[in-house]
């Protein structure tokens, strides 16, 4: 996470011909949007596809599954109780990209996506295609065990239950070496 956009610049710097794409989430983009400015500065034609689910939703899902709670994974305002459960932030990724000299499209349909990609291929400068996707929809489960430890000491019953499950997973973990 955070590697894709800089890596796409490296591919272009290595002399790649043809199109170079970075397929990233909104969270990854916000980690290093300055790389897009570098692409413009250096004349490196890359196309960045930003899948916008309003946060680090995969991390949120992992936290919910392993520790029973998530914190700060969604790009939201605080609600009246000061929890991060308010409105989702209206981040304009296209304006951000355009402010750095890239060409940008916001697409909502397959037809718009195809058209944006065709137009991006014709461009000589860096491009960004913004696609808003479902916030909490994921593919099929991977059935893998993640070594993410819930707190050992807690008053929260759900976290205690998940800690027991974690310890069972650790007992089954195999080490190679």
Which ranges hold each PLM region?
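Thiamine diphosphate
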Residues: 1-177
């Amino acid at each position: 996470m955070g590697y894709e956009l800089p890596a796409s610049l490296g591919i272009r710097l290595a002399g790649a011909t043809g199109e170079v794409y970075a397929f990233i989430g909104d969270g990854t983009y916000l980690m290093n949007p300055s790389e897009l400015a570098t692409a413009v500065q250096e004349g490196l034609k890359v196309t960045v596809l930003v899948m916008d689910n309003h946060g680090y939703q995969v991390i949120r899902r992992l936290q919910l599954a392993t520790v029973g709670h998530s914190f700060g994974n969604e790009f939201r305002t605080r609600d009246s109780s000061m929890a991060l459960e308010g409105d989702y932030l209206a981040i304009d990724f296209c304006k951000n990209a355009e402010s750095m000299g890239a060409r940008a499209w916001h697409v909502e349909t397959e037809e718009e996506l195809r058209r944006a990609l065709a137009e991006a291929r014709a461009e000589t400068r860096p491009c960004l295609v913004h696609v808003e996707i479902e916030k909490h929809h994921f593919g099929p489960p991977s059935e893998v065990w993640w070594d993410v430890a819930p707190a050992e000491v807690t008053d929260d019953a759900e976290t205690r239950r998940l800690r027991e499950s974690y310890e069972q997973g650790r007992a089954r973990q195999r080490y190679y070496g």
